[in-house]
Amino acid sequence: ARQGALGDVLANLLDSQGWKVSREFYYNDAGVQIGNLAMSVQVRCRQLQGESLELPENAYHGEYIVSIARDFLDKKPVIPHGGEPIESTGDYGDTDLIRRYSVAYLRNEQDDDLSALGVRFDNFFLESSLYTTGAVQKTVQAIIDAGYTYEADNALWLRTTAFEDLGNGLRDDKDRVMKKSDGTYTYFVPDVAYHLNKFSRGYTKAVNIQGTDHHGTIARVRAGLQAASKTLGVTIPKTFPEYILHKMLSVVKGGEVVKMSKRSGNYVTLRDLVDWAGRDAARFFLVSRKADAEFVFDVDLAKKNSDENPVYYL
């Protein structure tokens, strides 16, 4: 929720000052959690078909998973915003199709939420495309060729500690695994490939709006970019990309904290906030605190038509 509002306000501000701004949404549609998503939908499909089985502990339990499964079985096509239609065959044994269908389904849900808040994007970028185009593999090879990797414990490591300044004195305190013993890449590797792609498209400045749990990513991504740039013969600024890290918000409604968990399926959407408080009030509240500060969205306060509500003074 905060990402959308913070990013949109920052983009509008930069645009008003003469910057040429492009708003890009990076979809994390690859990796372990997406595998869990596909597995969860498959299990729900089998349950809807009458099979008696339980959802695994690492599955997603929300009702939205049932909705995806039901639409998949009904062979309803999904047309992701800015993408090609994905047709369902109803074959829940087709893991790849279920993965693509589920991702597209949730992309639309996210896009509808952002639209309700008045947030727009110029471009949509899929993490999975970095694998299908070979960008991840090429990035890793560029880093290897630059001499910034080594093998230990059956894994490939990036020598992040070789870089003493990764922007404003930032440096990593230990080397990081790039490729695990099972052959899969760690989560920051596609991030490096993505930012190489972005830099190659002519972007001289990139600002990522992410949660504070990504703090450790900054040094790893910048180290990967600096290493790859040696092989590619390009000069990438040490501070590329820049980051604005925000803490998650909690929601209070009726004087009580709304309990939220993506895995259990309990959550509040942006559309909920807009429905409860209105678009303008929601946007104002979401950017009314420093990004890295704890934030409580008091729905009842946001709806008040009195001087207790900060929006009242605008």
Predicted regions and their residues:
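NTP-dependent nucleotidyl-transfer catalytic core
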Residues: 1-314
